[in-house]
């Protein structure tokens, strides 16, 4: 059974090779998890193998970890997001599902319950959702907050490296011994005909994008609805979400990123960014070079002089008029020096809470 000395390693193994099941050996010691009936119950695609076959499936496994069995909750609602779908915190449904999963991990009474629940959930849930929720929980739980959490790029390099370079990396990993591998040069396929290519190095910089991902780990939007929680659970949720100076740091962080972006633009003979106008065309094009192998999709490009259009999807509806209204309300709140909370009580922004309140409301609740 897992002991305090190897809990850290076992949690780290849950993040490794996210598209391979837990009973496949991972890590330098070729360690696999020993599965049980509870695991197969929530992972029916492996049920045909049976417990004994799963636990002897990988002949290269040198160590088999047996996790203490504990009751596990239902993941039925969270399973609505398929494993092969993209995950984004800017989609309300995804955010809600992430909140529910964070709640599950956060409310586990001890490390045994957390490890077993995470092991069972890992191979049935969307890998990006699982990584996000477990990382948020581990960063904020008192018994795991001191554990080093692996970075997103270590286990999802396809989000940060183009497919060509990733294919070369896989070839080296499979065919060449670790001591004989050579660095892979990531070439920039750019053209002078598109001015936006001059700043590709900044927009798709690994550090900048990792910072954005990590920001949402440290400052998550929140968990599921508070109505069904006990008073203690509500207070615990507030400790995760309502951190001191969160709104102020949100504003400062974005101000600094824009300042650096404008600096890079000036260094590349480009003008500073213009104020966003929801009704006008955007002059510059944008052609991202990255995608994601799991979904087989590339990020959508933006052609020159493109205008904002309504988005009407089954699970994600956004209308330009609505966005413009929210933007106008933010400006109005700033100009009037007050905002109206849910109880319709004016709250002046003359206090220290001013920037905190504004920065806290802007990310997900502009209205």
Feature locations, PLM:
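C-terminal accessory segments of proteins
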Residues: 2-367
């Amino acid at each position: 059974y897992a002991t305090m000395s190897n809990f850290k390693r076992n949690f780290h193994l849950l993040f490794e090779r996210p598209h391979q099941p837990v009973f496949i050996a991972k890590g330098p010691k070729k360690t696999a998890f020993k599965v049980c009936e509870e695991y197969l119950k929530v992972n029916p695609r492996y049920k045909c193998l049976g417990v004994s076959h799963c636990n002897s499936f990988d002949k290269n496994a040198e160590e088999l970890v047996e996790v203490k069995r504990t009751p596990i909750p239902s993941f039925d609602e969270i399973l609505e997001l398929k494993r092969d779908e993209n995950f984004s915190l800017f989609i309300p449904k995804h955010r809600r599902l992430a909140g529910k999963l964070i709640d599950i991990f956060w409310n586990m009474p001890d490390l045994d319950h957390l490890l077993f629940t995470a092991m069972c959930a890992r191979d049935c849930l969307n890998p990006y959702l699982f990584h996000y929720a477990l990382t948020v929980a581990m960063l904020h739980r008192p018994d795991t907050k001191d554990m080093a959490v692996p970075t997103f790029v270590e286990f999802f390099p396809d989000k940060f490296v183009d497919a060509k370079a990733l294919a070369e990396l896989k070839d080296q990993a499979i065919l060449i011994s670790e001591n004989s591998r050579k660095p892979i040069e990531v070439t920039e396929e750019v053209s002078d005909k598109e001015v936006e290519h001059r700043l590709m190095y900044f927009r798709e910089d690994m550090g900048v994008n990792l910072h954005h991902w990590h920001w949402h780990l440290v400052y998550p939007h929140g968990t599921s609805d508070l109505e069904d929680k006990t008073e203690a659970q509500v207070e615990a949720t507030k400790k995760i979400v309502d951190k001191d100076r969160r709104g102020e740091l949100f504003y400062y962080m974005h101000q600094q990123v824009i300042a650096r972006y404008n600096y890079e633009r000036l260094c590349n003979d480009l003008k500073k960014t213009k104020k966003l106008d929801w009704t006008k065309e955007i002059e510059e094009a944008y052609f991202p070079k990255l995608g994601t192998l799991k979904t087989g999709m590339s990020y959508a490009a933006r052609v020159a002089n493109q205008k904002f259009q309504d988005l009407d999807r089954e699970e994600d509806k956004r209308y330009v008029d609505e966005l413009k209204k929210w933007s106008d309300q933010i400006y109005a709140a700033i100009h009037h020096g007050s905002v109206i909370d849910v109880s319709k009580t004016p709250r002046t922004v003359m206090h220290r809470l001013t920037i905190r309140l504004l920065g806290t409301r802007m990310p997900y609740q502009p209205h």
